[in-house]
């Protein structure tokens, strides 16, 4: 039996995000016909949509940069927070498909499985080695501490003459 995924733009794991150019001759959507941009691979909107779907807020406080991501239904073991090249914060997650019993009869499938991946280039005034992440009630919070602003080194010069 084939399970049909629902389409919801607010679901971070949905593979069916709205494409405003879908249906136009120059559209990037998988259903567009006769694209005038043959170098764009057709059908990529649904394959990449799961990676673009995770909604993440980023705010800056005097002490830190704080990232908040809604990851409902994920366990902390299914979420990864990494730093690449010392200044790129990468937040990813994957919800696996549940084991399907062959004897079960499905009436509706609204919970989806899939992956998401988001990257953020951190400003220079951060301390990536002190990043902390926590998850509570389906919300991932990543805190990136900021460095203390350097005070200028002032040297007095004696005036002669």
UniProtKB/Swiss-Prot annotation:
Any single GO CC term annotated in Swiss-Prot or TrEMBL for this entry = cytoplasm
Drop me one GO molecular function for this one.
unfolded protein binding
Please name the Gene3D superfamilies in this protein's record: 2.60.40.790
Print the keywords alphabetically.
Cytoplasm, Stress response
**Annotated InterPro entries:** A-crystallin/Hsp20_dom (IPR002068), CS_dom (IPR007052), HSP20-like_chaperone (IPR008978), Small_HSP (IPR031107)
Q: Does the UniProt entry include the keyword Ribonucleoprotein?
A: no
Q: What triggers production of this protein?
A: By heat shock, arsenic, azetidine-2-carboxylate, cadmium, copper, ethanol and hydrogen peroxide.
* Coiled-coil boundaries: none
| Superkingdom of the organism of origin | Eukaryota
Residue ranges of the sHSP domain? 47-161
- What would be one Pfam family of this protein? HSP20
UniProt keyword Cytoplasm present:
yes
The record's listing under PROSITE patterns reads:
SHSP
Instruction: List the subcellular locations.
Output: Cytoplasm
Self-association state and partner proteins as the record states: May form oligomeric structures.
Descriptive protein name: 18.1 kDa class I heat shock protein
């Amino acid at each position: 039996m084939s399970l049909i995924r629902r389409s919801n733009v607010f679901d971070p794991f949905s593979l069916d995000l709205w494409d405003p150019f879908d249906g136009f001759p120059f559209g990037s959507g998988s259903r567009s016909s006769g694209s005038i941009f043959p170098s764009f691979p057709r059908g990529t909107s649904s394959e990449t949509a799961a990676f673009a779907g995770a909604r993440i807020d980023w705010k800056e406080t005097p002490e830190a940069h704080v990232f908040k991501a809604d990851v409902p239904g994920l366990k902390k073991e299914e979420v990864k927070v990494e730093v690449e090249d010392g200044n790129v914060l990468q937040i990813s997650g994957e919800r696996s498909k549940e084991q399907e019993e062959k004897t079960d009869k499905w009436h509706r499938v609204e919970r989806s499985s899939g992956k998401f991946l988001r990257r953020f280039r951190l400003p220079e005034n951060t301390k990536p080695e002190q990043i902390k992440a926590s998850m509570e009630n389906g919300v991932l919070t990543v805190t990136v501490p900021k460095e203390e602003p350097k005070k200028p080194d002032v040297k007095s010069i004696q005036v002669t003459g």
